[in-house]
Regions:
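Alpha-helical transmembrane segments
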Residues: 29-34, 40-68
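Basic-flanked hydrophobic alpha-helices used for secretion and membrane insertion
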Residues: 53-239
Length: 239
């Protein structure tokens, strides 16, 4: 570089290198801070969404247990034609059938409702609302599955599969029948004891003996897909 006709040493390249080096050091620190802030933000967002999702799941489970089923809607006295038609609806996840057979008594004390449901209703709608499920759903005539609350009403604290329960069944048809049931399982339910009796389940073979059938259900139980709520499903069904 020439100044006033003389050659002056040029240190611009060294200065540029020093500035570039300093910028890189500063940039690395800034990038680390930005990366750390971004990672922290992602972690916080994930935590918030996880907590919110967990609360939604907990509220859903609590509501299902309180209702005794995860079915969000139902259709009374639905026909098999309606049953098959509902299965084809794009906003319905699954459909189950239930027959309300009657009530069970020990002496004069009502201890449990008596129902039969199909495999879809049991596995996808009832089981998720219960805990401590032991044994299997009734398959044979005379088999019975009771809630722990009903067993406690019978003063049974240590139930065993295969034990005999002498009970009276007051049927929906108006009949009363003394039956030696065989206990095939039990479960814990969470419905409000001040509102309703616990539910018990018997086999389809048993209710057929009484002249009832899942081919003529009292209720069609419906689980809708997540894109629609239960009230909207019922409104559409009754249109």
């Amino acid at each position: 570089m020439r100044i006033f006709g003389r050659n002056t040493p040029n240190n611009n390249q060294d200065a540029v290198r020093l500035l570039a080096k300093a910028c890189r050091r500063f940039g690395r620190g800034r990038n680390r801070l930005l990366a750390g802030a971004s990672a922290l933000g992602i972690i916080v967002l994930c935590t918030v969404f996880s907590i919110a999702y967990g609360k939604m799941e907990a509220d859903y489970l609590q509501a299902a247990r309180g209702n005794g089923t995860v079915a969000a809607s139902s259709l009374e006295r639905g026909t098999m034609e309606q049953y098959h038609a509902i299965q084809e609806l794009d906003y319905v996840d699954c459909v189950g059938r239930k027959v309300e057979a009657g009530l069970l008594y020990s002496g004069k004390e009502g201890i449990s409702g008596l129902e039969v449901v199909d495999s879809v209703a049991w596995e996808k709608m009832q089981t998720p609302a219960y805990t401590h499920i032991h044994g299997n759903y009734p398959q044979k005539e005379g088999e019975l599955m009771l809630s722990v609350r009903a067993l406690e009403a019978l003063h049974i604290s240590e139930p065993k599969e295969g034990m005999t329960l002498k009970l009276s069944a007051v049927l929906a048809t108006g009949q009363r029948e003394e039956i030696d049931f065989t206990l095939c399982g039990w479960f814990r339910e969470y419905e409000d004891p001040g509102i309703s009796l616990p539910v018990g389940y018997t086999s389809e073979a048993q209710v057929q003996k009484w002249g009832m059938s899942l081919e003529e259900p009292d209720l069609l139980l419906i689980c809708q897909k997540s894109t629609i709520d239960g009230y909207s499903v019922e409104d559409r069904l009754y249109e």
